[in-house]
């Protein structure tokens, strides 16, 4: 079955599924997927289908270049007409218009996009491991931390994070 987030299909198409239910049990009235491929515009072909039994908006799209990265957002709305733009909470890549400008090599934030932007690529490049002899003793006994240096340390760099390794070790 389809999972929430980005689903890569065997035929090269991609299915997007977005859970939409708030604490009061309400959902938005419509959802469109907007992105690089449709100039960030709300178009009929980006209108997502509603599955009320799963509280999920979904759509399957094709025609993507498998080796190209595409950026997108979900554009949700209600009868009030005020749309909300959100990234996919399950995405592996997020572009941030407020912070990415300070990071070398990150593409310019797309015109027409708002807030955080998700990205996907069908043929994702394989990560080039630097230490090929690394072995995990017990993958069920791992503690993995993900850290954004600029938010974790006042110096905003790896040296500042390394100075805090005792703190991280004390976390467990």
Predicted regions and their residues:
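Non-catalytic, glycine-rich low-complexity segments
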Residues: 1-26, 107-110, 133-134
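Core domains of carbohydrate- and sulfate-ester-processing enzymes
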Residues: 72, 76, 80-131
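Extracellular/periplasmic catalytic domains that process cell-envelope and extracellular macromolecules
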Residues: 25-26, 65-66, 136-140, 169-170
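Aromatic-rich, solvent-exposed beta-strand/loop patch
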Residues: 129-143, 148
